[in-house]
């Protein structure tokens, strides 16, 4: 598992080094984003220049499980909602989540902006569709951008990933 993650990270770096000018094809639009584990791994790799140990990964998963359990106890309506499996089992960010749910799974964003020019640059060819509802953008590791209207996640884009 560690070798696979390291291989993926190295291939991403090689891909970045060999690419020329970014094109619209480099941006994808999605209804589902990364998992909490993927965000954790990206943050850890960026912060420590290595992959987490088994113990560090286990500690993260235990803490995440506790946060999710606490959230569900405070918000029982989520347990019976259609997005319950995304939140409780897959731990994957998906359109329709609230800011609190996104933060619970993905942590705090690297950047928060309401600047339309920055959002347009990130969304590229998808901006005409996204701008209708997107009022705020959160930027996360792995070049993920989450677009919000008020408290709800309304769109997701990712830069530089193979087709989802």
Where are the language model's segments positioned?
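Residues within mature, well-folded domains
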Residues: 17-164
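Sec-dependent bacterial lipoprotein signal peptides
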Residues: 1-14
């Amino acid at each position: 598992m560690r070798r696979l993650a390291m291989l993926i990270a190295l291939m991403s770096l090689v891909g970045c080094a060999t690419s020329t000018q970014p094109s619209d094809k480099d941006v994808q639009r999605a209804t589902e984003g990364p998992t909490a584990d993927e965000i954790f791994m990206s943050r850890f790799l960026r912060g420590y220049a290595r992959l987490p140990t088994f113990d560090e990964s286990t500690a993260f998963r235990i803490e995440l499980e506790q946060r999710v359990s606490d959230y569900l106890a405070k918000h029982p309506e989520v347990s019976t909602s259609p997005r319950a499996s995304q939140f409780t089992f897959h731990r994957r960010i998906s359109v329709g989540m609230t800011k609190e749910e996104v933060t619970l799974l993905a942590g705090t964003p690297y950047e928060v902006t309401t600047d339309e020019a920055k959002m347009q640059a990130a969304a590229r060819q998808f901006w005409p569709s996204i701008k209708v509802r997107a009022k705020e953008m959160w930027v996360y590791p792995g070049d993920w951008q989450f677009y919000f209207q008020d408290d709800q996640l309304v769109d997701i884009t990712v830069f530089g990933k193979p087709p989802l």
